[in-house]
Amino acid sequence: MQDDLQYAQEAASEPGLRSYYKEKVLQQEEGHMKRVEILNQRIVFDDVFKIEEATLRFERFNGQMSEPVRRLVFERGDAAAALLLNRDTQKVILIEQFRYPTYKKGPGWLLEVVAGMVDQGEQPEETIRREVREEVGYQVSDLQPIATFYVSPGGSSERIALYYAEVGEADRVAAGGGSAAEHEDIEQVELSLPELWTALRKGNIVDAKTLIAVQWLQCRLAGQQNVKGT
């Protein structure tokens, strides 16, 4: 939390960002949130996921309401993910698995951080603890929040809660490999930091949540180096 506060303070020290955040905070405190009018909405597809169609008007930046517009939302649910560091080997734990939506454009098999969908009534922390056990066989004790973000806000409501955690061989409680009921076939991949940076530089990591996690780790380690150097 202290790191997050420091980051926010540093970001807000930039003149442009400072005025932007100040305006947004004042709007929230005064209840001046922009208006949205939902004229009608309906579910047009309902299988594993849902697609919602809505007609709405929204407040434009000039204060006027827009004309009625049609929007589609892919309702996939929210997810949780975690970047794991093996404290015994000082290697980052990733997974590799087949992802059919990426098969046509490639590569099909992706390097990713551990992740899973948040079940109804479940908190993201519960989700990621379960997924870490299922996919790589570790029991996680401490979770450090990195960020919560929208995956593709132009068409999907899905958010991912991303965490960082350290594990060791003493935390291994299962074989991992994924859920047989979900027909998962997951291979655990451990990369040293130089190997991870090389994979990033060569474009071998193409999953967005994993890119965010790895770049966060780079910033975190760079910050630690700067502190040591002062």
Model-predicted regions and their roles:
Residues I51-E53, L83, L94, L162-Y164, ...:
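Conserved hydrophobic/aromatic beta-strand scaffold that supports enzyme active sites
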